[in-house]
A protein has these predicted regions:
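Ubiquitin-like/PB1-type beta-grasp interaction modules and other compact soluble beta-rich domains
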Residues: 1-90
Length: 91
């Protein structure tokens, strides 16, 4: 089971703070997971942004480690948690 945790605008667009993806539905790579999540959550934030628009701006933590700039290719085998962190504003 893979847990996906959403924060800030990603949480608003997804309509949930977290979800669990059954092992059989977890794709091989993070980029594929993000496509899957965007398709599963077509809603928008109050500002009218959808998850599909927010995800490219996000930072991703995979089991607590930053995925880095090559995040679409990060393997998800054996991963338990992905955090979706959009840019934060304010102090």
């Amino acid at each position: 089971m893979l847990e996906v945790h959403y924060f800030a605008a990603a949480r608003a667009a997804a309509g949930t703070a977290q979800e669990q993806i059954p092992d059989a539905q977890v794709p091989a790579r993070l980029g594929e997971l993000l496509d899957q999540l965007a398709a599963a959550h077509p809603g928008t934030t109050e500002a009218g942004m959808g998850l599909e628009e927010i995800l490219p701006r996000c930072t991703f933590l995979v089991d607590g480690s930053a995925a880095g700039g090559s995040y679409p290719g990060v393997a998800l085998e054996g991963v338990n948690r992905v955090d979706v962190l959009p840019p934060f504003a304010g102090g």
